Amino acid sequence: MAFLLFFVFVTAAVLCFVVPAFLLLCTSVQRRRDVGQGGGRDWQKKKKLRLPPGSMGWPYVGETLQLYSQDPNVFFASKQKRYGEIFKTNLLGCPCVMLASPEAARFVLVSQARLFKPTYPPSKERMIGPSALFFHQGEYHLRLRRLVQAALAPDSLRALVPDVDAAVAATLAAWSGGHVASTFHAMKKLSFDVGVVTIFGGRLGRRHREELRTNYSVVERGYNCFPNRFPGTLYHKAIQARKRLRAILSEIVAERRARGGGGDDLLGGLMRSRDDGTAGAVALLTDDQIADNVVGVLFAAQDTTASVLTWILKYLHDSPKLLEAVKAEQMAIYVANEGGKRPLTWTQTRSMTLTHQVILESLRMASIISFTFREAVADVEYKGFLIPKGWKVMPLFRNIHHNPDYFQDPQKFDPSRFKVAPRPSTFLPFGSGVHACPGNELAKLEMLVLVHRLVTAYRWEIVGASDEVEYSPFPVPRGGLNAKLWKQEAEEDMYMAMGTITAAGA
């Protein structure tokens, strides 16, 4: 009976909420579509092509119930085992082609990226802002991407290390004391603070910072809700908070203009950037375009990074010998900095070899971004199969990361595997191609600094079960990994006595 009630609940939820939401994204594509558009030899060639193997499930709903009634990763893995590395399905009313090989991922994201466009539900675009760079292709996207990449390049990040370090120190200090707290929630606060520093530098006042934090949290809570504008719903509250974010950001921009300059941070770059008009005219980005891209960067910088940080704490906690080795590496830097009296430097973060391997393995194991959505803009042939125009195409990053053909014993947490670089296109934690995450180096810097501060000054203990996974929407240990954190005395004397300290230059 309990199972029946659960099944009815899931079915009702999908039919009443999830399906309508996603149908806003999906165009109606007939199951048996006419692939003979055009004429001559092209028509004859397409006529011979076949759709990939797979099941389309029930009308409209497709295989959505199967997906949501189990771990999504198990669903995709079972499909790959049955049909191979390219298969079709229907999810939330949309026909999809799933691709689970490095070659296919490269085909969609890099070599033939022009044939596939990013696709998001309209409700998501409204929430973040339609001018955010990851909703676009072409010149506008490339120009903004270059701007963001410049703000997050090594030369720029070098100057951000003290700010990131200060944000990490403040987060851990607020968490410490032995009380139980959600690791994920603490890491979300940290990632938000790092995002704010990256966008605004050190120029943002406390009032604006707290207003941004308050309203952004409301937007975030409504982001994955059914887009119901009825007053009182989470979605309606999120839309109102998004309007307030626009007003706050316009006020910040106006204050900077009044001071006569934009500054050398990301916001300053956006304020100086110009938009190529359709008639060839060039104008500065509008306040709406600036606001959309600021919210977009905050969105991209928070939950994904916070999820990985949460997994890093779990993996280190569950691997005591590895934790001691990481601690030895970090204590060498800590002692070289006179017990933390001198600031951590960019050069030192580049010397954290084992810690960097731990981060890469955490990215692989957790595979926070399990897949990405694209849409075919034309009929596409791939390995003798037809990918029809309008179908969704999903490179399955997690399936690639957990394939024993590319990573031996893939379910084992083994950072040493990254002593050797992975084969091309087999490790895609930040995507690939022109839409790959431009903030990947910032995210890794945040992770390195957190591990340094954590293992040299704190100890932590996981409270309760931590093996189950929940999706919010990214995978994290259930409950966000409840844990206690304590400040501990520095251990540099012990490490020096053991002879494990080596010179670590600044």
UniProtKB/Swiss-Prot annotation:
Pathway: Plant hormone degradation; abscisic acid degradation. It is an enzyme of class 1 (oxidoreductase). It comes from the Eukaryota. PROSITE patterns: CYTOCHROME_P450 (PS00086). The keyword Phosphoprotein does not apply. Its cofactor is heme. The keyword Membrane applies. It is a single-pass membrane protein. One of its GO terms (molecular function) is heme binding. One of its GO terms (biological process) is abscisic acid catabolic process. Involved in the oxidative degradation of abscisic acid. This is Abscisic acid 8'-hydroxylase 2. It comes from Oryza sativa subsp. indica (Rice).
